């Protein structure tokens, strides 16, 4: 049920997994390349920092760092956090030259400004804090 909306917007499960009922997670998840592209085009018009978390459901380090990503999204509410599964969106992973998971690509105005490969929570948090302004 809800196939068309689930395809366009993705399932809401991952987007709210680390949140509470009154406060859902701020990490967006896209299961559709078209929906991702719409979001990417919209955000590149702003000066807002975008953190793209390329992960996979089978990736242990990806699952390990996920709670920290949700905490960062709550802490840095002026930053846009997006989680993309490389198996669901291989074309987007290829476009960003992602070859290992997790890979975090930090983007501003549509341009990559930083890349972190691996579950390096402290490094990611420092870079997000520095680049969000």
Curated annotation (Swiss-Prot):
As for subcellular location, the record says: Cytoplasm; Mitochondrion
Q: Which gene encodes it?
A: TRX2
Assembly and interactions?
Answer: Interacts with MDH1.
Does the entry feature the keyword Mitochondrion, yes or no? yes
Organism listed in the record: Arabidopsis thaliana (Mouse-ear cress)
What function does the entry list? Thiol-disulfide oxidoreductase probably involved in the redox regulation of a number of cytosolic enzymes. Possesses insulin disulfide bonds reducing activity.
The entry assigns this protein to a family as follows: Belongs to the thioredoxin family. Plant H-type subfamily.
Alphabetically ordered keywords of this record: Cytoplasm, Disulfide bond, Electron transport, Mitochondrion, Redox-active center, Transport
Q: What is this protein called?
A: Thioredoxin H2
Q: Name one GO cellular component term.
A: mitochondrion
Site annotation (Contributes to redox potential value) points to 60-61
Cystine bridges: 59-62
Please give the Pfam families that the UniProt record associates with this protein: Thioredoxin
**Positions annotated as active site in the UniProt record:** 59 (nucleophile), 62 (nucleophile)
Q: Tell me if Cytoplasm is a UniProt keyword of this record.
A: yes
Coiled coil, from the record: none
**Transmembrane segment boundaries:** none
Q: What is its main location?
A: cytoplasm
């Amino acid at each position: 049920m809800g196939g068309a909306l689930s395809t366009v917007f993705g399932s809401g499960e991952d987007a709210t997994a680390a949140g509470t009922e009154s406060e859902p997670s701020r990490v967006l998840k896209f299961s559709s390349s078209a929906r991702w592209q719409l979001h990417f085009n919209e955000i590149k018009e702003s000066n807002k920092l975008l953190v793209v978390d390329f992960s996979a459901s089978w990736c242990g380090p990806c699952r390990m760092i996920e709670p920290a990503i949700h905490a960062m999204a709550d802490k840095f509410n002026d930053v846009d956090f997006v989680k993309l599964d490389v198996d669901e969106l291989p074309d987007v992973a290829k476009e960003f030259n992602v070859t290992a998971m997790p890979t975090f690509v930090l983007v501003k105005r549509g341009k990559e400004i930083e890349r972190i490969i691996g579950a390096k929570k402290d490094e990611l948090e420092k870079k997000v804090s520095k680049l969000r302004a």
